[in-house]
């Protein structure tokens, strides 16, 4: 369903599915799928034509150039006055994160979570998927808590992100904008190589090492 919905609206749709017995080809009630985590388009649901207009690459065909992530100023055509929103990127929303209210998300009837991970690293995908899997298991076991949700959110913040917010699901009236052009990850990594193959039977990985050489300073050579 659309990311502009709030939890109350999602629950109403879920209740109607059950009340009206709206079923899929399997004969079982259709499941509600919602975006749960990842980058948000300035158009929220992705119907954006900025990339197509400026670069000839359509976001609606999976080829977005993400020029909305750049820094922009707002100019008044009548007066020519320029307004800069300090510390914010006007067209770049923060990333969606539903971990802090995932229990309410599930209570509203959401049964399939969609994670936005286009052009993200394997590390990003692994971290996000395993974190949400752990949170869902905690909800199922009755051990989900705000304290654990805070720990999971910190874990998610270690990989690529533009800051987090809960989207419109909790009734936010306006979008929260990112304060950075790139990643706001709390942990910096050094790229040392790429795993090119893994031989499962013998437990051996083949790694292409990428070494970056920098000349030592005179102080280092003393």
Predicted regions and their residues:
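Catalytic alpha/beta core domains of metabolic enzymes, predominantly
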Residues: 1-111, 125-128, 135
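Anionic-ligand-binding alpha/beta catalytic cores of soluble enzymes and soluble regulatory domains
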Residues: 14, 30, 123-189
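Conserved, mostly hydrophobic/aromatic
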Residues: 34, 115, 216
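Short acidic/histidine-rich active-site segments
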Residues: 111-120
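Short flexible coil/turn linkers enriched for glycine and charged/polar residues
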Residues: 188-189, 199-201
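A structural micro-motif recognizing beta-strand termini
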Residues: 200, 206-212
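Single conserved hydrophobic/aromatic residue that forms the stacking wall/gate
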Residues: 213, 220-222
């Amino acid at each position: 369903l659309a990311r502009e919905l709030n939890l109350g609206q999602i629950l109403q749709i879920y209740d109607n599915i059950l009340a009206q017995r709206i079923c899929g080809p399997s004969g079982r009630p259709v499941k509600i799928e919602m975006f749960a985590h990842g980058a948000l388009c300035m158009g929220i649901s992705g119907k954006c034509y900025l990339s197509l207009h400026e670069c000839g690459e359509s976001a609606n065909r999976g080829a977005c150039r993400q020029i909305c992530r750049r820094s922009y100023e707002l100019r008044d055509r009548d007066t020519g006055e320029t307004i800069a929103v300090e510390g914010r990127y006007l067209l770049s929303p923060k990333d969606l994160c539903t971990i802090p209210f995932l229990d309410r998300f599930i209570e509203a009837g959401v049964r399939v979570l969609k994670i936005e991970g286009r052009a993200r690293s394997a590390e990003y995908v692994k971290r996000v998927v395993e974190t949400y899997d752990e949170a869902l298991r905690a909800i199922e076991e009755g051990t989900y808590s705000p304290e654990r949700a805070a720990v999971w959110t910190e874990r998610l913040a270690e990989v690529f992100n533009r800051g987090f917010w809960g989207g419109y699901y909790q009734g936010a009236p306006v979008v929260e904008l990112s304060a950075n052009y790139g990643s706001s990850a709390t942990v910096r990594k050094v790229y040392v190589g790429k795993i090119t193959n893994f031989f499962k039977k013998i437990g051996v990985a083949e790694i292409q090492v990428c070494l970056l050489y920098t000349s030592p300073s005179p102080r280092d050579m003393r």
